[in-house]
Amino acid sequence: MENFSNSKRIKSEKLGIDLIRSRIEGYVKDLKLRHVDVDELVERIVSGWCEDMTRKETIDYCSETAASMITKHPEYGQISSRIIVSYIHEITMDSFVEKIKYIQKHRGMVSEEMYGIILEHGETIEGMINYENDFLFSYFGILTLMKSYLIKVGEEIIERPQDMFMRVALQIHKTDFEKVREVYNLLSGHYFTHATPTLYNSCLKNPQLASCFLITPREDSIEGVYHMINQAAIITKYSGGIGLNLHGIRSKGSSLRSTGGRSNGIIPLIQVLNATKRYINQGAERRPGSIAIFLEPWHMEIFDFLELRKNTGPEEFRARDIFTALWINDLFMERVKNNEEWSLFCPSQAVGLSDVWGEEFNALYCKYEKTISRTVVPAQKLWKAIIEAQIETGTPYMCYKDACNRLSNQQHLGTIKSSNLCAEIVEYSSGEETSVCNLASICLPMFVKDGWFDFEAFRRVVKILTVNLNRVIDFNYYPVEEARRSNMRNRPIGIGVQGLADLFAILRLAFESDGARSLNQDIFEAMYYSAMEASCELAEKEGPFPSYEGSPISKGIFHFELAGRKASGNWDWEGLRERIRRHGVRNSLLIALMPTAGTSQIFGNNEAFEPHASNIYTRRTHAGEFQIVNQHLVNDLVRLGLWSYEMKNLVIENEGSIQNITSIPHEIREIYKTAWEIKMKSVIDLAADRQVFVDQSQSLNIFIAKPTYSQLTSMHFYGYHCGLKTGMYYLRTRPITSAIKFTVDKKLAEKTLSSMNDTDDPCSMCSS
């Protein structure tokens, strides 16, 4: 325990300027950094130096000072990271086993099974760990890990990032050390990551590793409603994000047979869920509890539902910590398009309407319009209320009920009634089954090899993740029985991606280019094929998932065929179909493109499949406020001899855009268009192209700087007609007024811009 007895002493020790300079010079030499000015960095450190700073305070100050220069060049971020990681290594023990013992002694949080495995096989496990890989993290990534992911005792960080990765590998494969090594090496090398709850809870007591839970109330009664609230509370306690639907809960004013009273409707119920979410804290400063509530647009209280997150209005009708989402049927979209009437019903009278979809829904809905009481509104009036809510609050999400059911390998189980917290999971849930999804994402930039995307390496990793997520299903702790029952019966998984925009930049592909569109399709076809192949191989050994019979895949129908599309011919789909006919598949669902908000920060990738929001921006997280530079852009401009203090100021002055900086070659400007400059039609086209190979859905954000009714209507209908399941996760908008850019020397920027050569000579880097 020597490291821990010395930890406080190390923190309180003082570091001198000479030692700081020596260390920085060593980092620059070791990392072969060509763009770090040691004298300038040390000068900045000296300018704010305080003689009585402790070692911990000095480390924080020096790393923050280096990080403040990231906009000068991303290499300063490597210095920041090196300072922090070196310090973590100083104050933590070298032995993984000793750290686990220490955690168990002081917090008692390691599971007895995993504790026994670690103690028995400690030498084997420690021989696999490479702590040098901790230095692969960016400054931003390492701070995020320190703040929220690495295990602490009190305020003391006990483990290193590699220890966390080893916990994950051990949790998944236990004593199968060949697979433990394989998974650890890929995690350590930043090829993929498991979901945040898996990183948090692996090897701990009650290892709840799943991200997403979808709840349907058992019944419209006090007992049914509070059973749902109880489930939500317990799942939130164990780091799960929740999507639930209230389609079947009666509306305000409807009669209560048991008491003779009147229902207060869904708004007070949503406020109870809102308060529950606020009350329950998931692991202190870790993942906060979150709930998304789905409602069909025929529900009598739909207009009040749309008001829930608005900034103004009576507080008794607001629940701003809840995320709202719509579960939209085709008939509503048709009526909006044709400017027809729309009927609102109380679910206690419109019995079974949420239980059907497609033509069956249309027939029942039209029957109810003729036979039961209803409120009639113009469909476009409701549509306008939806758009107004989205412009003000960014929500509700737009999920298309009929597409989600029509294009689902779980359609044989019953009607799917909602998505999840992030609108990428589409699974069947009922009063008896709370659906679950276990997630992981692949870091796409890691598969660039000699200027090409390495599909074989990519396919190998997809197959490894498919196996991993099956083990997660098997070894997961299920906080409620309904979740265990559903996950064991249907065995859905969700493999996603991060860094698609980074991949395009590395390969010199503009987001809107034909090349990007083609690669996008090829990646997700390969991903679906590889996951399906691995799932079939597992089924050969372990049998198909228990609810396999009757599913589309049991009939030899792939997801892209449900969508009426054909595969490219790159892969042997017919051979795979024949193998599935013989053995089945182990999983009902395979691909789900989640937001990756937390893990992409750790691994230094752009989120999921999104375009870059900016080329220079401030990131705010639990760990603080950070300036992020698009390092691919900086590297390109450095090669062209264009990156300078003045250029940095120009990019800041242009709010992270380079489109008006004509000294930058046109090809480069095309590659680094931001989300605000890319046509949303192109973003939706990419989403639609990959959707045919995504058997769940995708957390698709829409970026419109100053959205209007007509713009949003156009985007929604375009995505709907393209066959998207999730038409919109969040609507991202920009502030009406820009913040004052205190760091910009505006006159110098203008002078530099006017003096630059504005000819668009071809870029040699883009011609290959």
UniProtKB/Swiss-Prot annotation:
Disulfide bonds join 212-437. Under complex allosteric control mediated by deoxynucleoside triphosphates and ATP binding to separate specificity and activation sites on the large subunit. The type of nucleotide bound at the specificity site determines substrate preference. It seems probable that ATP makes the enzyme reduce CDP and UDP, dGTP favors ADP reduction and dTTP favors GDP reduction. Stimulated by ATP and inhibited by dATP binding to the activity site. GO terms for molecular function: ATP binding; ribonucleoside-diphosphate reductase activity, thioredoxin disulfide as acceptor. The active site is at residues 420, 422, 424. It comes from the Eukaryota. InterPro entries: NrdE_NrdA_C, RNR_lg_C, RNR_lsu_N, RNR_R1-su_N, Rrm1. The record marks 729-730 as: Important for electron transfer. GO terms for biological process: deoxyribonucleotide biosynthetic process. Keywords: Allosteric enzyme, ATP-binding, Deoxyribonucleotide synthesis, Disulfide bond, Nucleotide-binding, Oxidoreductase. Belongs to the ribonucleoside diphosphate reductase large chain family. This is Ribonucleoside-diphosphate reductase large chain. It comes from Encephalitozoon cuniculi (strain GB-M1).
